[in-house]
From Swiss-Prot:
Gene designation: TRIM5
Zn finger residue spans: RING-type: 15-60
InterPro entries with a match to the protein in the record: B30.2/SPRY (IPR001870), B30.2/SPRY_sf (IPR043136), Butyrophylin_SPRY (IPR003879), ConA-like_dom_sf (IPR013320), SPRY_dom (IPR003877), TRIM/RBCC (IPR050143), Znf-RING_euk (IPR027370), Znf_B-box (IPR000315)
Pathway noted in the entry: Protein modification; protein ubiquitination
Organism of derivation: Chlorocebus tantalus
Chain residue ranges for the region called Required for interaction with GABARAP and for autophagy: 187-200
Residues the record lists as Phosphoserine modifications: 87
Domain annotation B30.2/SPRY: ranges: 283-515
Protein name: Tripartite motif-containing protein 5
């Protein structure tokens, strides 16, 4: 029993690297102890392989060299153990063959087993390659050391694979969480769009119901009156036929002619096959439009209007609103500011002026177009204009003019890109158009192209990409539907936001980014 205890103690104070009793033992923070020479050699190997962290050869827990401590207690145990000599019986159990009792001196290569000389001659090991343990111990020590290094390298690869897998797992989680957020946002937008479309469609159906039922109710009343008239006429005829001869003949020709000339009034009908057919909205297209609008809104700038004493337009104190003011010019005597007015014109272009020096004012133009204070010379810019309840307006961008400059009317009245205007407009309440360059036959008149706008916008978004040379207009009321886009604009000069309320007293309002 004492020998068993000694063997166990010996195992506890044996170096895991060299498998010998510890020499100058050093302990790591994890609790494992090694010979000073062995752990030092391990450090050098770590530096050779450029490992960032040093780890325990047994449990692979990282440690810092300064945390290694000499273990004097273990050193004392090793010294005492070296002084203890096992009894012959105990030594026999450790170093002698359990079968033959002979000392174990040989190594069988085929069976990878330590044997005695009698085992070598037995049938079990006959013909095997056997060597003295001293002859092969160093060779196998080198092989085991090589295997250990290979295993450590594979362990490093395994740890890297583990770290890569953990990193990929985290990356996937982040990506999927991001996709979840986007999906939720997209479906929330779709729900909003669907709610709006449903409400709009129901409103259309309610209006259709109101109009049709109102008309049919009117027709029903007329049919009731017509039927009642027929009843009264039939009753009159029956009375004549049943009465005296005098009653029969009294005014008979007039009654007969009235009956012969009578035509039944037919009710107004509505054909169901001619009704507007409901079609489900293109959700993907609408969502793409909404995403494009969300993207350009990232470049929203706070635009204000430049003061304008020339243009016949009223700018609010907050410089966000412009409205048309109906001109009221009173006649004054010659020599005063205003004399008689002839050939009076209302012009709704960019600001212009004409000096008034005599008592007669001819061909006077009132202008209602105004510019934004901020010039655009690079980058991307976006703003929105509230045009609700207006029956006419023009908006977009204007290039080449300073907000406080006085221009020539004849030069600036043409809304053409070649003159520095990239604008769209509304007139007569429902006619939308874009102003393009005139033809070679009419170079001084813009070519006005009608625009198909299904839902009239209460708010219009304007997006300028200076580097891409584009100006885009969005129908905010219709989920950001693209109204029109100018491409290949020649922005050779700074451009300014342009608003023109035209001859409509309802104001145009620049919306703040927070609205």
């Amino acid at each position: 029993m004492a020998s068993g205890i000694l063997v166990n103690v010996k195992e506890e104070v044996t170096c895991p690297i060299c498998l010998e009793l510890l020499t100058e033992p050093l302990s790591l923070p994890c609790g494992h102890s090694f010979c000073q020479a062995c752990i030092t050699a391990n450090h050098k190997e770590s530096m050779l392989y450029k490992e960032e962290e040093r780890s325990c050869p047994v449990c692979r827990i990282s440690y810092q060299p300064e945390n290694i401590q000499p273990n004097r207690h273990v050193a004392n145990i090793v010294e005492k153990l070296r002084e203890v000599k096992l009894s012959p019986e105990e030594g026999q159990k450790v170093d002698h063959c359990a079968r033959h009792g002979e000392k174990l001196l040989l190594f069988c290569q085929e069976d990878s087993k330590v044997i005695c000389w009698l085992c070598e001659r037995s049938q079990e090991h006959r013909g095997h390659h056997t060597f003295l343990m001293e002859e092969v111990a160093q060779e196998y020590h080198v092989k085991l050391q090589t295997a250990l290094e290979m295993l450590r390298q594979k362990q490093q690869e395994a740890e890297k694979l583990e770290a890569d897998t953990r990193e990929e797992k985290a990356s996937w989680k982040i990506q999927i969480d991001y996709d979840k957020t986007n999906v939720s946002a997209d479906f929330e937008q779709l729900r909003e769009i669907l709610d709006w479309e449903e409400s709009n469609e129901l409103q259309n159906l309610e209006k259709e119901e109101e109009d049709i039922l109102k008309s049919l109710t009117k027709s029903e009343t007329e049919m009731v009156q017509q039927t009642q008239y027929m009843r009264e006429l039939i009753s009159d005829l029956e009375h004549r036929l049943q009465g005296s001869m005098m009653e029969l003949l009294q005014g008979v020709d007039g009654i007969i002619k009235r009956i012969e000339n009578m035509t039944l009034k037919k009710p107004k009908t509505f054909h169901k096959n001619q009704r507007r057919v409901f079609r489900a909205p293109d959700l993907k297209g609408m969502l793409d439009m909404f995403r494009e609008l969300t993207d350009v809104r990232r470049y929203w700038v706070d635009v204000t209007l430049a003061p304008n004493n020339i243009s016949h337009a009223v700018i609010a104190e907050d410089k966000r609103q412009v409205s048309y003011q109906n001109p009221q010019i009173m006649y004054q005597a010659p020599g005063s500011l205003f004399g008689s007015l002839t050939n009076f014109n209302y012009y709704t272009g960019v600001r212009g002026s004409q000096s008034i020096t005599s008592g007669k004012l001819t061909n006077f133009n009132y202008c209602t177009g105004v510019l934004g204070s901020q010039s655009i010379t690079s980058g991307k810019h976006y703003w929105e204009v509230d045009v609700s309840k207006k029956s006419a307006w023009i908006l977009g961008v204007c290039a080449g003019f300073q907000p406080d400059a006085t221009y020539n009317i004849e030069q600036n009245e043409n809304y053409q890109p070649k003159y520095g205007y990239w604008v769209i407009g509304l007139q007569e309440g429902d006619k939308y158009s874009v102003f393009q360059d005139g033809s070679s036959h009419t170079p001084f008149a813009p070519f006005i192209v009608p625009l198909s706008v299904i839902i009239c916008p209460d708010r219009v978004g304007v997006f300028v990409d200076y580097e891409a040379c584009t100006v885009s207009f969005f129908n905010i009321t219709n989920h950001g539907f693209l109204i029109y886009k100018f491409s290949q604009c020649s922005f050779s000069k700074p451009v300014f936001p342009y608003l023109n309320p035209r001859k409509c007293t309802v104001p145009m309002t620049l919306c703040s980014p927070s609205s």
